[in-house]
Regions:
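SAM-dependent transferase fold signal centered on methyltransferase-like domains
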Residues: 1-383
Length: 383
């Protein structure tokens, strides 16, 4: 639930008291109602807003002193993803960016002073952003021109009537309306948006294994497809980029099973760059329509499964018994199989852990029995 402007002002002015109150809460789901009652007793009519702020901050995804409500925190672009976009635009000599749907300012924290301006139609989010970031932020409609920024960023609504939007023309506002008003743009979309007809660059970004967004850049900023894989490492953030920079005859054809089965990062799959990644890593697909890859090594820093045997679906029970399988990770792609139901049906009684990948090769459904997931390291399978 969003805040009123009065509530935002109260939260800004009572930061120290709120921090003190938060430290005294139990902070568990079971104690939630008791915690809310305690905050209402202490802060009166502002207790609800204080409770929501403390709950929104509890995820730890954003700076601890920021103002946020539940929805804005949940919808916020992860700082690492925003930082990648800022770097991308900086590399293209963009001096000033206008974030048309800035919300509480998560994009802004990635930009240097004097290079970012934010606006939003929601007055309470504008007020929170003004507290959170040291950039100009004001209230404005995304379909109006209010600055001379070289590039505008927009994050149209991704749901309508509770359903996730998958078509560009259904976004609110639609990209066509944004492009009619502004020049070069970076339009943030859900990972599953259909970007096949986009004329510029479609950049799909994942962070620590989860696909976070597809960002559509206009033609002046780039073209083609790109997968960006961000991983948090002890030494910092690692960035891997896969682009559609190969000709068709340079891409590997589907082939037989190798030593390992590999499920590529979701950003690679969403960007349509499975074969490009395979070419770079010396891998190939088992089937041209299925994203699983195979080869004789694991790419460094990834994980996969060591192949044991192909098993006909009708002979799965016998195979499980033969390999003494007691626990089973089941992955499904290209087949209508419920992993939980299949696991119950197999009635595992063994003592070893295995992985079963149910997929399709050609017109047939197949089950690929593998060992448990293994991670590539310098001393393991990577060259």
């Amino acid at each position: 639930m969003s805040y009123t402007l009065d509530e935002v002002a109260f939260l800004r002015e009572n930061a120290a008291a709120i921090d003190t109150a938060a430290a005294d809460l139990e902070g568990t789901k079971k104690a939630h109602l008791r915690d809310v009652a305690k905050l209402q007793a202490h802060f009166g009519d502002y207790g609800r807003a204080v409770a929501e702020l403390i709950q929104a901050r509890s995820s730890g995804k954003l700076p601890g002193q920021w103002l946020m409500d539940h929805d804005s925190a949940q919808q916020a672009t992860p700082p690492a993803v925003a930082a990648y976009r800022a770097q991308f635009l900086q590399e293209r000599n963009v001096d000033l960016v206008h974030d048309l749907t800035c919300s509480i300012g998560t994009e802004g924290q990635a930009f240097a002073p004097g290079t970012y301006v934010g606006s939003d139609l929601d007055a309470s989010r504008v007020a929170m952003a003004q507290h959170n970031i040291e950039h100009p932020v004001f209230r404005a409609d995304a379909l109006t021109t209010t600055t001379t920024a070289q590039v505008c960023i927009a994050d149209p609504a991704r749901r309508q009537g509770g359903n996730r939007i998958t078509r560009l023309d259904q976004l609110l506002p639609p990209p066509a309306d944004l492009l009619a008003t502004h020049g070069e743009m970076a339009i943030k979309c859900a990972p599953g948006i259909d970007h096949s007809e986009w004329d510029g660059l479609a950049c799909v970004v994942s962070l620590d294994g989860g696909v976070k967004e597809t960002c559509l850049y206009t033609r002046g900023l780039g073209a083609g497809k790109r997968a960006v894989i961000l991983n948090t490492m002890p030494e910092g953030l690692h960035t891997d980029v896969i682009e559609d920079d190969l000709d068709e005859d340079e891409l590997p054809e589907a082939g037989p099973m190798g030593r390992f089965l590999i499920d590529p990062d979701g950003a690679i799959v969403r960007a349509g760059l499975v074969r490009h990644y395979a070419a770079r890593e010396g891998l190939h697909q088992l089937d041209p329509r299925i994203a699983y890859l195979t080869g004789d090594r694991l790419p460094h820093g990834t994980s996969g499964f060591e192949f044991i045997e192909m098993v006909p679906m009708k002979k799965l029970k016998a195979a499980m018994a033969a390999h003494d399988v007691g626990s089973l990770e089941i992955l499904v792609r290209g087949q209508d199989v419920n992993p939980d139901q299949l696991r119950k049906k197999l009635k595992l009684k063994g003592s070893t852990a295995k992985t079963l990948v149910v997929t399709r090769i050609g017109t047939k459904g197949v089950a690929v029995l593998c060992g448990p997931r293994v991670v590539s390291t310098e001393g393991n399978y990577a060259p």
